[in-house]
Amino acid sequence: FDYRSVGDPQTSESYMPFLDSLTENIIKGHTLTCTKGGGTAKTEYEFLTGNSCKRFPGMVPYVSYFTHSQYSLVTTLKDQGYQAIAMHPNKATNWKRSTAYRFLDFDEFISIDQFSDTAKRYRGMISDQANYEKIVETYENKEPGSPFFLFDVTMQNHSGYTNRYFQADINCNGYDSDEADQYFSLLKLSDEAISYLIRYFQQVDE
């Protein structure tokens, strides 16, 4: 979440310099989600199916509703010949994703089990850099000639932001809060990681 969409945080340095530098061959904007601070699976459900979680008050569709196949964006892409992979570097059982992704028509689900024990972590969670390196690895091993769709739910910036062993490199001026410093420092690390991913795919023939 970029707090500049709702305010003007004053930080000791820019926390998204690479993304801010992109002005060509890119579409930028904002989106609204049905939840904040948790319940990521609800946002996933809305994005992938186009349905609203308002139909499921107090419920998480992945957990309570997924007992059969669901038409989704993945279905449309599969009909067009895409290889469809879901990735989330956490336990496959969280929010019953292993079941939900299968019912959403994904060919494969890459969970924390497919990441090396030596993969870079921050605050105990897989870093965006390690996550994106896994995307590149997966792409390079995809079915030859097959178009490729990968739905990725990262973990690096998951709350909370009170880990005393994490070294924050950015200070949020005007806030006496280690949590804010950690959050914006993590965003900077995300910006560096997305730079790696975008630069890689800029060199790939479409």
Show where each model-derived region lies.
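Solvent-exposed soluble domains appended to multi-pass membrane proteins
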Residues: 1-206
